[in-house]
């Protein structure tokens, strides 16, 4: 975000000793600003998300959640991005609070390899359906691009991204 200003204001959402800020810009901008300007020292861990939708495979490069985590790792701060495979604005994140806390505390205690950002994706399931945690490599799938050209009521052209996921190797 080199063509606009970044705004940052101290806020208070949760009670506790943590410092809380609201910053404009992209998630990666906010991490850069926080680490290099706002905070007096590097944080022990950057936790990004939880966001709506999967950040698996190629989707990592489009994700604000993961861009924040990756930026933190580039800055030398261990990082985790959390995502839920549910695009609904009424998504229920509650079943995953305990797991997020468990992963976060384990990362703080045992550490994360230098310049590494963990990418944690939760399926859209109920709490009683959770069977555990599986560590895996990033998938090799990609999106087969297709754009539907449409016209809005004012007669202006726009495009709707459609397409499909390819499960073949790149």
Where are these regions (language model features)?
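Active-site rim beta-loop-alpha module in soluble metabolic enzymes
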Residues: 84-90, 108-153
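Short, glycine-/small-residue-rich phosphate/pyrophosphate-handling segment
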Residues: 86-104
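A cross-family phosphate/adenosyl-ligand binding-site feature
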Residues: 1-30, 34-35
């Amino acid at each position: 975000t080199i063509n606009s200003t970044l705004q940052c204001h101290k806020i208070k959402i949760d009670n506790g000793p943590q410092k809380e800020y609201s910053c404009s810009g992209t998630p990666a901008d906010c991490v850069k600003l926080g680490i290099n300007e706002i905070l007096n020292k590097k944080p022990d861990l950057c936790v990004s998300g939880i966001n709506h939708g999967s950040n698996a495979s190629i989707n990592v490069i489009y994700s604000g959640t993961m861009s924040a985590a990756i930026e933190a790792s580039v800055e030398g701060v261990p990082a985790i991005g959390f995502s839920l495979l549910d695009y609904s604005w009424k998504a229920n994140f509650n079943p995953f609070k305990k797991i997020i806390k468990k992963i976060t505390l384990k990362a703080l205690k045992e550490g994360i390899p230098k310049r590494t950002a963990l990418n944690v994706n939760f399926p859209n399931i109920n709490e009683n359906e959770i069977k555990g945690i599986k560590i895996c490599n990033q998938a090799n799938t990609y999106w087969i691009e297709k754009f539907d050209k449409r016209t809005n009521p004012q007669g202006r052209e726009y495009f709707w991204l459609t397409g499909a996921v390819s499960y073949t190797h790149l």
